[in-house]
Design a protein with these regions (language model features):
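Membrane-proximal extracytoplasmic
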Residues: 1-366, 374
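Hydrophobic transmembrane alpha-helices and their membrane-interface caps
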Residues: 34-38, 367-403
């Protein structure tokens, strides 16, 4: 009786004595090694998780008015979009924020096009002449999650959070030069503002009004293009005016004339530079594992945190290492003495650890299969099975990278 081979048996018989079989096996293994080297190591999976925040300003309105006139009508419009999973809204005085979450797997570009189309083709939901401003859409995705966060903190009581914020903004410009970085921003801290407190008696004493001061401030804090000068076949653009940038600029601002003498703003007002009221409070403190990380235990210290996100499809490990190395180089220049930098998030390291652990587990599983086959059937069969498993894994890794 003649035995008929099935599909797998016929395929094996075809390649058993074929001269291309060793070449294909070696090629598959080399492609697998190539895929392991070039595949980006990322903490967050490269899947389409699209959501967006829609900001609608309604100046002067209360939270209840924002909810009734902005949030509820917008929720109805956004809920009709195909592929939307959830719509959330937050109403506060003068502003409504709506969050649109799409289903996992919805293509990002198509989802955002549908969102913009729904918002700007349904502008008639806004009541006329009530002061509701056009919506602002800020889309977010999986690549907006920071891969590195560096916390700047200090125990120096002479430094305030606005000092840390200035240092952080200076570091942002340097970090953005690292290839592969996408979004760099700072969390926490207080901006430095100039507070002007007018003295009504001094204003009246110089024969001025509040409207005179307002016009002087508005006219002085402007920059305009004033033409160009041509010299030696070179055109030099000319700008008139400067922006007010510090307390001294504001204090020495001429706001009028009195008895043929200029009146400066600090003649009629008390001008103080100080930190603005913070939107968030950020502190740095250590836990039980501080000594293991090489950090001296501290209770609480003011801090700001620089968050760094990466571009899609790039290697988180390489970018994180480059960012940390760049911060180390800046410690002697932009980071003054007494300000400490602690890496509080490093998804590059965790992604590399997980990838290495996966390869170790695959290697352990392959060796276990080879040893089990060796003990049960013999060394020849173990070599055949081990080679087949390794080649299959290598081809799978390459296919995963390619598609």
């Amino acid at each position: 009786m003649k035995n008929t081979l099935g599909i797998s048996g016929g395929l094996a018989a075809r390649f058993q004595d074929n001269a291309l079989t060793p070449l294909l096996a070696v090629t598959a293994m080399l492609l697998g090694v190539f895929a392991v080297i070039v595949t980006p190591r990322e903490e967050e999976p490269q899947i389409d998780v699209t959501f967006a925040n829609v900001f609608v300003a309604f100046p002067g309105a209360s939270a209840i008015e924002v909810e009734n006139l902005v949030a509820l009508p917008m929720e109805q419009v956004l809920a009709e979009i195909d592929g939307v999973k959830h719509v959330y809204s937050v109403s506060r005085p003068g502003m409504g924020v709506l969050t649109v979450q799409f289903k996992v797997g919805e293509p990002r570009t198509e989802a955002l096009v549908r969102l913009y189309n729904a918002i700007f083709s349904n502008q008639d939901w806004r009541p006329p002449n009530v002061g509701i401003l056009p919506p602002i859409v800020k889309p977010k995705g999986i690549d907006d999650v920071p891969i590195v966060s560096a916390t700047l903190w200090t125990e120096d009581t002479a430094r305030a959070t606005q000092d840390l914020l200035k240092i952080a903004h200076a570091l942002e410009a340097e970090i953005k030069r690292v290839p592969g970085t996408r979004d760099v921003y700072t969390i926490g801290g207080s901006r430095e503002i100039v507070h002007v407190e007018l003295d009504p008696q001094r204003v009246a004493g110089f024969g001025m009004t509040l409207d005179d001061l307002r016009q002087a401030l508005t006219a002085s804090n402007t920059v305009a293009h004033a033409g160009a000068l041509v010299y030696d076949n070179t055109q030099v653009p000319v700008q008139a005016g400067t922006f007010l940038s510090n307390r001294e600029d504001v204090a020495r601002l001429v706001v009028g004339m009195f008895e043929e003498r200029p009146v400066y703003l600090d003649d009629v007002a008390t001008i103080v530079a100080h930190a603005d009221q913070p939107d968030t409070y950020t502190w740095f403190a250590t836990g039980p594992a501080a000594e293991e990380a090489g950090i001296d235990p501290i209770a609480y210290a003011p801090s700001v945190t620089i968050a760094i996100a990466k571009k899609p499809g790039t290697n988180a490990t390489h970018i994180a290492d480059a960012v940390i190395e760049r911060l180390a180089q800046l410690e002697a220049t932009l980071i003054p003495e007494g300000v400490n930098v602690t890496i509080t998030r490093n998804y590059g390291k965790t992604a590399d650890d997980k990838a290495s652990k996966l390869i170790q587990k695959l290697s352990f599983a392959t060796m276990s299969v080879i040893l089990l086959t060796w003990f049960a059937l013999g060394w020849r069969e173990a070599i055949v099975v081990g080679t087949a498993v390794i080649v299959t894994l290598a081809a799978t890794l390459f296919a995963s990278w390619a598609w």
